[in-house]
Amino acid sequence: MLVILKETARKLGNVGDVLKVKKGFARNYLIPSGKAVRATRANLAILENSKEKLAAQQAAELETASELAKSFTEIDVLPIYAQAERGVLFGAVSAKQVVAELSKKGIEITTKNVVLGAPIKALGEHEVRIFLHSRVECSLKIHILDASRRGADGTITGTS
């Protein structure tokens, strides 16, 4: 079944792309969630009329994502504090925590942009991938530290 994407999907494509997908995927997920519409003659005509506007919008989004990616190069390691005992976390560090720490540094993204390879359940350094656009991705090192060793001023107390 041919569909036209109404929003960017990480592994599918960008807004305005005409894709051939399985009928069940289109009927059960893409169309009901508003991510795509059927590629009828009328919808293709509407797409054709708005191609220039769409191209300008995508170029602006790509430029914004590239600028945002440059701000990630300024961050060497992002510290995240979590409750731990004997080097093992009580829960996993989530994308929500990564987004919260980045917002403290003035970088605004959503949890949809952050991809954790596996649940982070141990102290130490971990790699996190950030998808800002279908063509722009970057990686970020995060350092998980024990929250009980964090001082009142934010510095680490004691020895490891």
Curated annotation (Swiss-Prot):
MF annotations from Gene Ontology: rRNA binding; structural constituent of ribosome
UniProt superkingdom: Bacteria
Gene Ontology cellular component list: ribonucleoprotein complex; ribosome
Transmembrane segments: none
Disulfide bonds: none
Gene3D superfamilies found in the cross-reference section: Ribosomal protein L9, C-terminal domain, Ribosomal protein L9, N-terminal domain
Keyword Acetylation part of the UniProt annotation: no
Role, per record: Binds to the 23S rRNA.
Name of protein: Large ribosomal subunit protein bL9
Gene name per UniProt: rplI
